[in-house]
Amino acid sequence: MSSAGDSGPGYVLNDFDAVPRGTRGRRPGLVKDSLLDLVKVQKGSYNSFTPNNESNERLEAIFHTIFPISDPLHRATIEFLNCRVDDLKYSESECIKRGITFSAQVIASIRLVIMQDGVSLEKYQEIKEYDDHSKLATVIKSAEEQEVRFCELPMMTDKGTFIINGVEKVIVSQMHRSPGVFFDSDKGKTYNSGKLIYSARVIPYRGSWLDIEFDVKDHLYFRIDRKRKLPISVLLKALGLSNNDILNKFMKNRVYKHKSGWKVPFFPDKFKGVRLPFDLKNVEGNVLLKANVRITSKLAKNLYDNGLKEYLIPYDSICGLFLAEDLIDSASSTKILSAGESIKLEDIKKLELLSIDKISVLNIDNVSVGPYILNTLFLDENMSYENALYEIYKVLRPGEVPVLKIVEEFFRNLFFSPEYYDLSNIGRLKLNSCLGLNYEENLTTLTHEDIIEIIRKIVLLRDGQGSVDDDIDHLANRRVRSVGEFIENQFRTGLLKLGRAVVDSMSTSSLDKVSPSDFINPKVLTNVLRDFFNSSQLSQFMDQTNPLSEITHKRRLSALGPGGLTRERAGFEVRDVHPTHYGRICPIETPEQNIAYNSLAIYARINKYGFIESPYRKVVNKVVTDQIEYLSAIDEGLYYIADTSAKLDENNCFVDDMLYCRYAGTFVMVNSNQVSYIDLSPKQVISVAASLIPFLENDDANRALMGSNMQRQAVPLLKPTAPLVATGMESFVASGSGAVVLAKRGGIVDSSDSNSIVIRAFDKGGINYLDVDIYHLRKFQRSNHNTCINQKPLVHVGDCVKEGDVIADGPAINNGELALGQNLLVAFMSWQGYNFEDSIIISSEVVKKDLFTSIHIEEFECVVHDTPLGSEKITRAIPGVNEENLYHLDDSGIVKVGTRVGPGYILVGKVTPRHSLSLPPETKLLMTIFGEKSFDCVDSSLYTSPDIEGIVIDVQVFTRRGEEENERAFLIKQKEANDFEKERDHIINVINQYFYDELRKILINSGSQDRESINFIEREGWWDIGLKNQSISKQVESLKKDFDEKVSHAITNFKRKVEKLHEGYDLPQGVSMSVKVFIAVKHSLQPGDKMAGRHGNKGVISRVVPVEDMPYLEDGTPIDIILNPLGVPSRMNVGQMLETHVGWACKKLGEKVGNILDEINKIKRAFCEAIRSLSDDDFEKFAALYLDNKKFEDINDDEITASILDTPNKDELNNELTTLVENYFNSCKDAHSSLRHFLIEVYSCGSNLSICNNIRDINDNHLIEFAYKLRDGIPVTAPVFEGPKDEQIVKLFELAGLDNSGQVVLYDGCSGEKFDRKVTVGYMYMLKLHHLVDGKIHARSVGPYSLVTQQPLGGKSHFGGQRFGEMECWALQAYGAAYTLQEMLTVKSDDINGRVKIYESVIKGDSNFECGIPESFNVMIKELRSLCFNVDLNAK
C-alpha cells in the first residue's frame, strides 16, 4: 500500500509495509496467487450447496426428492415451488457474544392442493402434466400457496468456519471409499494352499452393499450388507434368469454334429500344445495324427490349411461334457436332457436313436475356462424365481412372513430404486469404466447388466484372465466428502423425517380450513442439522491456537467419522504414503498415532466428483507452457510427468533429451518428446505447515513432521517478529487464515485507529465512489484455546489500498507475514550440564524484553438462576465478606474493567436464598436480636481460581428478554449505543465530504458559482443552486439521489443495530441473567515452558540465566539461547544448522547496512553543526537559497539536510560556504552510492532481479528509508526444496565478513575466559509452545477420592494426586524400604480408617500410626466373589 500522494520510482519498494524479502531460491517463482486459496476446500464446497444469486439447484433438488407429499387417502398433496435463504439476523461477532448459532432461515414456497371428492391423485397429476388449466379447476377443491420456514441453516463465515452456540467449529473433510465396484483377492493368505480367493464389492453412495466372492471349492456366492452368503444363482434367478439364460450369459458353447460319427469344428488356436488322447481323424475317417502327439501351433495351422475344418470325436470324449441348453425331442416335445446336465454314454446312444444330430455343450476345459457358474448352479438347480426372492428376503428380514408382492418390492428397492439406492454420478462413471458399459451418468442405480458384468469379470479373473489392480489406497478409489456434501446429506435426512411427519399429520387432520404451514414443523429439520454440528465426529472444535493451526485444521482430511474407519481399524496401510499422494496429500504432515488424519498439499484442490487434483504445467513439443491443468490420480497415470529439476533453456524448452518422469506410479527414463506435463512447483508435494520450514530438504522426515506439528502449537506472542529466514509462504498463510483484515474493495483510508479502519471505497478504476467500508478490529478477544486475538492497523490516513491488501495484522502476524516466534542469537554448546537431554538455557534478557511473553484470555461466567425460594441476585452486599474485599466491585456487584485480580478475588457478587429452617440456632438468635436479613441468603459469588492472576479486560452482562436490567447492563448497552452513533456520524461525515466535494466541482466547473463566493453559502443550499441550473440539473439530481440513499442507509443500519441491542437475550430455561468476565493473564517465559524450532528441535527450559553470566561474543554481545549440539546429528535435522548460518549472515549484513547509515548520519550531523555555526550573513544567504528564507530558530536538522538536492551555485555563495556544501553533497553522494552498491550485491545472490532493479531506480531518500528497515537484519526466503546452495551461503558469509565455518570465539560470562574451541553461533527462529509450565504444575494435599477404590483421583483437572505406580513400588522393594512402601500402599492411598487415624495423630502431635487393609484389597475380594470364589480374610 502507498500514500495517496506517492509517486516516482520509490513506489515499488514502498508498496509493502513489510520489508521485501530477498529470495535465496534457485529459480523465480512461477505460482500464481490465485492458486493459493487455502480455505477453498471449505468455502467452495459449502457455496456449491447453499443458494446464491445465480442458482440454488442442489437445495431445490433435495426438496424435489421429497415433494410432492400426499396423504394416505389421496385427499390432498403438498407441492414444492421454490426456496431461498433469508438474510442473516446477527453478525458473526454478535453470535459469538450471544452464544448463538450463526445461521439463516431456509424459506420455501409450497402449495397445498385439496382434491374434489372422488378425484384420484393420479388424475390430478395427469392433468397437471398436460398443463390443462381448464380441467384443473374441475378436480381441485382448493389450492393455497404459502412461504414456510423450514429450518435454521448454519452459515459459513468468511474464514470457512461455523459458529455453533457461540463457538467456532470446523467441519473436517472425510476421505472414504469412492462409490463403484472393486475387485480384490486375498493374496493367498486365507488358506495354507496359497489358493487365490477372488471377490468383488459394489459400494454405493447410499444403499445396500453387494459382495460377490468365491469359496475354496470355487463356488460363487453373494452377500447383501454382509449378511449370510447365498449362491450366486439365487441372485441371478431373482433377476428373472432361467438356467438356460444363466449358462448362455456366462459360458461359451461348442456344437457337436452327428453324421457318420460325432463331428467337432477344428480351431487351430485351441490346439496349441495339446496332446489328444485319441487319433485325430478327418470326417472321412482318415487318421491325420496319432494319439498323444503334441500339437504345435505350426502343425495345427498346417492341418487347418490342408482342409481340416472338422474332425471326428469318439464317444468317450463326449461323455462327461455338459449341455449348454435343454435337449427337446421334436417328435414328442419332451425334454430329454436339461441344460447343465452331464452327458453319459447311454445318453449318446439315446440321442442317436432319436435321430438328434446336433448338440450344444459348454466349452469347459478346466484350464482356461472353469465350471464355476455351473457348479454353483448345481447347488440349487431347481430353485424358481419366487423361491430365490424368498431366500434373499429370509436372510435380510429373518422371522417375517414373505409375501410375493412385498418381497418383489423389497428386492427392487435394494438396488434398483433411486429412492433407496444411489450410486452417485461418480459411482456410475467408475462402473462404466471398470465394466466397459456406456450408461448415462445420471443413472445412479444398479441395472441387471451391471450385476451380470460384475459376475462375468470375477469369473474371468478366476480363469486367469486379467489381474486385480484395484488398490483401495489409490486415490482413484478414494474420494473426499466435504462440508457441502455432509450438510446436503443431513438436509436430505431431515426432509425425509419431515416428510413422514407431514404424512402422519395429514392422515389424522381434517383438511377444512388448513394452510401449508399447519403441517410443517421446522424443528424436525433444524434438530437434524443441530445434532450433526453438535455431535458429529467430523464437526470439531476449531484449533485456534494460532493462524497456522486454524488453516491446517480447515485443510485436514480424516478417514474417521460416519461411513469411514474407526480409530481401532485405522491401520498402517491407511496412514501410509501412497504414490498417488504426490501433489495431493502431504507425506510429511501425517499423524503420529492411529488417528487417520492427513493434510491437503498446498496447491491441491477437490473436483466436483470429490477426487483430489494437483496442478501441472502443460508441455507441448518439449516446450513448457504457462498453461496450468489440474489432473486427478486417475488421469495422472496416463501421462509422463517430469519434475521441476528438469533443465530448461531461455525458451522454456527441455535441454536434455532423456528425462526421469513419473508414469503409472513408477519412475521411468523417457525421451523428452513423450513428456506431457511438468510439476508446477517443488513444494506442491507438501502441506502448508511443512512449507513453512526452511531447508526442509535437509531434515529427516520424522523431525520435519514434528516441526510442522509444533508450529501449530506455537502461542501468539506479545511482540511477534517475522523470521529472518523464511520460505515465502508466510504472507500467503497470514492472508488466507482469516487472522488479518483484508480490504474488500480498493479506496482511500479515511481514518485508522486501534479499534476500526474506515475506507472510502471506489470502483476498480478508482473513479466512481461506491460506499464507506468500516472494518472493526478484534481487540483482546478469547480464542478457542484461550489465546489472545488482537488486531492492529497497518494503514494510515490517506493511504491508498487495493482489494485484498492486508490492512490490519492479527495474532502471530507481523506486517502481513506469519510470525509465530522470535529470532534469537543461538549457540550450540554445552553449558554446565543445564542443557542435558534437549534442555534449553535462556538469557534473562529475553525474559526482560518480553520477547516470549504471551497473553491468554480466561473466561469466567456467573449465572443467575431462578430457585424455588426465589431468584438469585447479583449484589455487592455479600454476607460474611469484608468491605476491603469488595473495593474492586461496582455498585451492581460486578468487577470493574481494568482491575488487577488474583487468586480468590470476587468477580461477581451473588447471593442465593436459603430456607430459614436450614439456619443454625445461633444465626436465628442474631437475626432476632439485630433484625439482619442477610442471613436469608448464602454467598454464591464467582471467585477467581487459584492459578489466575491478571487484569479484567471485559465484562458482558446478558439479561433475559422481559427481565429488568441492572445498572451495569444499562451502562454497557449505553456505551455500545454511543459507539454505534459515532460510527453512524463518521459514515455520514465521509459521505458528506465526498458528495459535497463533487457538488462543489460541478458548480464551479459549470460557472454557477466561483471559488470565493461558494464558501459563503451553506452547503445544504448548494443543491438548490445546482437544481436550478438546467445545464447541470440532471447531474446534480442524480448525485443528490445517491447522497440521500447512502445517508438513509447509514441511519437505517444504526437504528437496526440499536433495536437489536435493546431486544434482550435468549437464555436457558431458569436463567434470568448471565455475567461473563474476561481476564487477561500474562505468561512470561520461565523454566518448565516448552520451546521448539521449526525443524523438530524441541526442548524444555531448564534455567533462565542472568545475562551477565551468559557466554558472549568478542564484541560483548551476549548469547540469547544455548542448545545442545548433540541434538543435531542423532535427529538428522541439519536444516536448523543451515538456518542458523543464513540467519547469522542476514543479521551481520543488516549491521553493515546500519554502519553505512550511521556514517551517513554522521556526515549529516557534521554538516548541520557547520551550518548552525555560520555567521548571520552567511546563514541568511544559505537560507535564501535553500530554506525559503526561514529563520535560524524555525528550522531543524532534517530540513537542512533535505534541502541540499544539487551542487551549489558559486555565484550566489562565497567560496567557504560553497566548499562546505560541495563537500557535504559529494560525501552524501558517495555514501549513498556505497549503500546502493552494497544492497544490490546482497540481493543479487538469488532470484531477486526486480528488487535489484528497484534499488537502482529509487531516489536517495527512498533508499535511506528502505535501508533503515534492514538494520535489524536483511530478511530472506529459502523456498522449500529450492534453498540456497553451499556456494550462495558462503558468498553471504563473505559479504557479511564472517568466517566460512560459521563458528566464532565465545567467552564465558562467569569467568571471562575464552572457551576452548570455536562455537557455532547464529540466528534461529524459536517458538514458545502452548505446553506451559503454569498449566502443568500441580500439587495436592487432600482432595477427591474414587468411589470404588477410594484411591485419589488423577490429573490436574480432577485435583488429583501423584500416582505411585507399579514401577515405583519395585524401586522401594529394591531398596528394602518396607515401611515406606507400606505407608504408600495404605494410609497415603486407600486405607480409609488408616488415613483418618493418621490425621488425628497429626493433630495430636503423635508421630505413630497404624496401617489397615487398603480398600483395593476389598475390591479384589468382591470381584473374586462375583466369580463364585468365596474368599475370607481370617486373623490368625
UniProtKB/Swiss-Prot annotation:
Class of enzymatic activity (EC top level): transferase
Pfam families: RNA_pol_Rpb2_1, RNA_pol_Rpb2_2, RNA_pol_Rpb2_3, RNA_pol_Rpb2_45, RNA_pol_Rpb2_6, RNA_pol_Rpb2_7
GO BP term (any one): DNA-templated transcription
E.C. code: 2.7.7.6
Keywords: DNA-directed RNA polymerase, Nucleotidyltransferase, Transcription, Transferase
Organism superkingdom: Bacteria
Alphabetized InterPro entries for the sequence: DNA-dir_RNA_pol_bsu_ext_1_sf (IPR042107), DNA-dir_RNA_pol_bsu_external_1 (IPR019462), DNA-dir_RNA_pol_su2 (IPR015712), DNA-dir_RNAP_su2_dom (IPR007120), DNA-dir_RNAP_su2_hyb_sf (IPR037033), RNA_pol_bsu_bac (IPR010243), RNA_pol_bsu_CS (IPR007121), RNA_pol_bsu_protrusion (IPR007644)
Catalytic activity line of the entry: RNA(n) + a ribonucleoside 5'-triphosphate = RNA(n+1) + diphosphate
GO cellular component annotations of the record: DNA-directed RNA polymerase complex
One annotated GO molecular function: ribonucleoside binding
Transcription is among the record's keywords: yes
Reported function: DNA-dependent RNA polymerase catalyzes the transcription of DNA into RNA using the four ribonucleoside triphosphates as substrates.
Similarity comment text for this entry: Belongs to the RNA polymerase beta chain family.
Subunit structure: The RNAP catalytic core consists of 2 alpha, 1 beta, 1 beta' and 1 omega subunit. When a sigma factor is associated with the core the holoenzyme is formed, which can initiate transcription.
Protein name: DNA-directed RNA polymerase subunit beta
Organism: Wolbachia pipientis
Organism ancestry: Bacteria, Pseudomonadati, Pseudomonadota, Alphaproteobacteria, Rickettsiales
Record gene name: rpoB
